[in-house]
């Protein structure tokens, strides 16, 4: 394919994606169906609470046993839902932890919005943590957050702005939104030197944040609680090198890296390989 044709097709694609309707489609993923706690034999309370912009979030809450006790918010990735992370709920609850499985805006059963983004995931996570700490079954001094993919990056961002978490866990988190977007642009064969940089600036304006201000490699050194980076060595979407980059940027923060050999980006069958290291970390931190 000639360079001229690549540019022409890229321009047509950009016109579709970056028009207001295209941006809404791009940043409002289709909602993933899933199972419920009942189907897995978990007794969960169906709850909802407010987030920003007058929206409401849906979640499943499993109280700690015994209560009051420690508890964690679990946040899914892009285009996923709380249902996708239900396999983590059982081992967490067996360890005596309360679990709040959250649907971010535009995902699962939560309210829609004009778009979703990693900073909005972090906003929703903040509201979920505040709701969790107010529950009488929860010890508010022993709370943590676990996130996958975009949710993992949101955990790092939220944890960098809070001083009331005992632990944070980011599974398959990307190190920098720009790196993630460049990989995405490459998949569409959009030439970065010619058009890609403009796309990234346009998206920054659309979401209201500069990538450098919200990147994990920028904010990780501000985290005041222990952070676990769990990452599959065979992740095809967010390379393992991203986890190493976050670790290298940690400064004085307490950060541990848990490589999961042979694990991809988040296949359910890989959860058993994540659980031992996750539970060891949480038992020490909480």
Q: Predicted segments — roles?
A:
Residues 2-50, 60:
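An N-terminal hydrophobic leader/cap segment in hydrolases
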Residues 84, 115-136:
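Alpha/beta-hydrolase active-site loop
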Residues 91-111:
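Conserved alpha/beta-hydrolase
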Residues 137-149:
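Alpha/beta-hydrolase fold nucleophile elbow
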Residues 157-209, 267, 272:
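Hydrolase active-site cap/lid region
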Residues 222-223, 229-231, 235:
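Short beta-strand/loop motif that positions the catalytic acidic residue
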Residues 236-242:
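Conserved alpha/beta-hydrolase "acid-adjacent" motif
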Residues 270-286:
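Catalytic active-site module of serine/aspartate enzymes centered on a nucleophile-bearing elbow/loop
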């Amino acid at each position: 394919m000639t360079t001229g044709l690549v540019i022409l097709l890229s321009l047509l694609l950009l016109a579709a994606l970056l028009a207001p309707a295209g941006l809404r489609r791009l940043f409002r993923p289709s909602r993933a169906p899933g199972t419920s706690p009942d189907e897995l034999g978990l007794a969960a309370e169906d709850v909802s609470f407010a987030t920003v912009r007058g929206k409401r979030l849906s979640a499943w809450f499993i109280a700690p046993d015994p209560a009051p006790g420690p508890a964690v918010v679990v946040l899914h990735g892009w285009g996923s839902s709380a249902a996708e992370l239900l396999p983590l709920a059982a081992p967490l609850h067996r360890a005596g932890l309360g679990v709040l499985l959250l649907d971010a805006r535009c995902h699962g059963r939560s309210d829609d919005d004009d778009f979703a983004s990693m900073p909005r995931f972090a906003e929703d996570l903040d509201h979920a943590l505040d709701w969790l700490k107010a529950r009488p079954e929860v010890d508010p001094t022993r709370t943590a957050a676990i996130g996958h993919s975009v949710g993992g990056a949101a955990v790092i961002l939220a944890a960098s702005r809070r001083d009331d978490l005992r632990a944070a866990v980011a599974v398959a988190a990307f190190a920098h939104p720009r790196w993630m977007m460049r990989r995405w642009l490459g998949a569409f064969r959009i030439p970065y030197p010619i058009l890609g940089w403009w796309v990234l600036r346009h998206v920054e304006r659309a979401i209201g944040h500069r990538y450098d201000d919200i990147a994990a490699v920028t904010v990780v050194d501000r985290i005041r609680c222990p952070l676990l980076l769990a990452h599959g060595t065979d992740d095809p979407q967010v390379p393992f090198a991203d986890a190493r980059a976050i670790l290298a940027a940690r400064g004085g923060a307490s950060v541990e890296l848990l490589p999961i050999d042979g694990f991809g980006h988040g296949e359910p069958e890989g959860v058993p390989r994540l659980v031992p290291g996750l539970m060891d970390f949480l038992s020490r931190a909480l």
